[in-house]
Amino acid sequence: MAKIQMKTPLVEMDGDEMTRIIWKMIKDILLTPYIDLKTEYYDLGLEYRNETNDQVTVDSANATKKYGVAVKCATITPNAARMTEYDLKEMWKSPNGTIRAMLDGTVFRTPILVKGITPYIPTWTKPITIARHAYGDIYKNVEMQVKAGSKAELVTTDANGNETRELIYDFANEDGIIQGVHNRDKSIASFARACFNYALDMKKDIWFATKDTISKKYDHRFKDIFQEIYDNEYKEKFEAAGIEYFYTLIDDAVARVIRSEGGYIWACKNYDGDVMSDMVATAYGSLAMMTSVLVSPDGVYEYEAAHGTVQRHYYKHLKGEKTSTNSVATLFAWTGALRKRGELDELPELMKFADNLEKATIQTIEEGVMTGDLAALSTLENKQKVDTEEFLLAVNERLQKLM
């Protein structure tokens, strides 16, 4: 059988620990036998990031801007223990954070649904995608503990040196705390465009929610920017695609989400998205069954799994023990990237391959062959728990039939 050809390379970002092992297995078992795989390779493993003073991360982000589609393996974000373990020159930043900032991207996370793993919320029969704004709010805050007798004010100084002051609170007789947060119109607009573009791409409704009734300047600004961009740039496109943009208050949104059947994109401010993406992932069953894609406002895509490097399994692997590590989210990162590359380069064969590989993966699990984490969740009667490699080989058997 002739291999499927590619025109433009994918930007390939390798990673760390068990996911790095799985990365190679996926390529060897499921990709290179079928595709003449073209990638521009960047090793984002912690050792090479350390060796290059993290320049490799910057280079990979620039390559993603150039080519438009990337696929990324999970990577270690170092802490004090990793500093010692890897003898690092310094505590390098999160590669995801660096890439997200360079692409000005929004992260979209979507659960992968399979029969036998029922969401904890029975009405959820379709996936809910969480879109999280990745800039500002409490993540770039300034905080202070305040002593009694202090007065806290919000002060801005304009270009001409003129000050505007607002009293926050007069801590006349008591200690307390204060926090300053900010956001930028440009970042909010980028977030809005990424959300609207992704909704058009996926042909799904989009919901957005803030607390603008209480936060009449801060949250209201988010609401206004979204509405303005929607009305001026996207309304006609949405109507033509038969999808809608829906705004409501965050508390109403949560109630509606719980009652809904799913099947839409839920755009959230930074903190809301941080919290709700974990809630949604857990309610659907597993972080290892979540896809994650970073989308820039100018249409650059970076696909990855929503989970970490599976350190515990990696240490077992190093001892020569078999592991039963779930590879589904990593596999779907590859299929997402290949499908998008096929779409951009007008390669229907490549898109069909990505579809077939996803079908084969879901079919494998629904026929009872799965890794240990899914076996613990699945309600199927005849389950077979397999190791990491056996699962990929089982997927390959089904893929061959679909081809």
Can you describe what each PLM-predicted range is?
Residues 6-25, 154-248:
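Glycine-rich phosphate/diphosphate-binding loop of Rossmann-like nucleotide-binding domains
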Residues 2-8, 18-23, 27-52, 61-64:
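N-terminal alpha-helical transmembrane segments of multi-pass membrane transport
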Residues 36-41, 202-210, 234-247, 342-354, ...:
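Flexible, glycine/charged-enriched surface loops at secondary-structure junctions
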Residues 134-135, 140-192, 199, 344-347, ...:
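Glycine-rich phosphate/pyrophosphate-binding loop and the adjoining helix
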Residues 47-164, 271, 275:
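N-terminal glycine-rich phosphate/adenylate-binding segment common to multiple enzyme folds
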Residues 46-60, 223-264:
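N-terminal small/polar loop signature for handling phosphorylated ligands or for N-terminal nucleophile
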Residues 257-356, 363-367:
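Glycine-rich phosphate/nucleotide-binding loop
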